[in-house]
């Protein structure tokens, strides 16, 4: 090896050693039914928004919802956990990012039901039915955290 190549090799080593892995977003664990297509689309929505998503297919979501504190009547087709919060249903990634940034004293967020046009429930016409993202307080209270659809 000549001097020039040796020098280039020595200069390259620190650069290679400094290379960083791409930044990864917050880890979200999604519990869903294996057969649910809209859940898969919501998972894709989160991944495209920069979240690291782990999916666990469940045969019974009831115990998961109960464990994390999803109130009766406020459920949907999948339950996620991120940063000490639950995320129930088709909550937009931007609202989850806001939750993690603001860190309110709460159990989590929910979009009850499956509103047309919410992430994972998009329709060909582009229609978005009005829906609310609800914040579930530690005491079980609910308040509107975000509103989507007409009149946003």
Briefly describe each language-model feature range.
Residues 1-12:
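N-terminal secretory signal peptides and thylakoid transit peptides that target proteins
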Residues 43-82:
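N-terminal, post-signal-peptide region of Sec/Tat-exported proteins
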């Amino acid at each position: 090896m000549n001097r020039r190549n040796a020098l280039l090799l020595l200069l390259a080593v620190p650069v290679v050693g400094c290379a960083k892995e791409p930044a990864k977003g917050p880890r979200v664990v999604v519990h869903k039914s294996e057969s649910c297509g809209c859940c898969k689309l919501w998972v894709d929505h989160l991944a495209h928004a920069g979240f690291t998503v782990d999916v666990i297919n469940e045969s019974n979501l009831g115990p998961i919802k109960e464990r994390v504190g999803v109130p009766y009547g406020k459920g949907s087709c999948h339950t996620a956990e991120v940063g000490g919060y639950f995320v129930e249903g088709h909550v937009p990634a931007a609202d989850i990012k806001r939750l993690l940034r603001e860190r309110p004293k709460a159990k989590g967020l929910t979009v009850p039901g499956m509103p047309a046009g919410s992430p994972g429930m998009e329709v060909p016409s582009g229609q978005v039915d009005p829906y609310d993202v609800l914040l579930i307080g530690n005491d079980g209270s609910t308040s509107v955290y975000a509103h989507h659809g007409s009149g946003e």
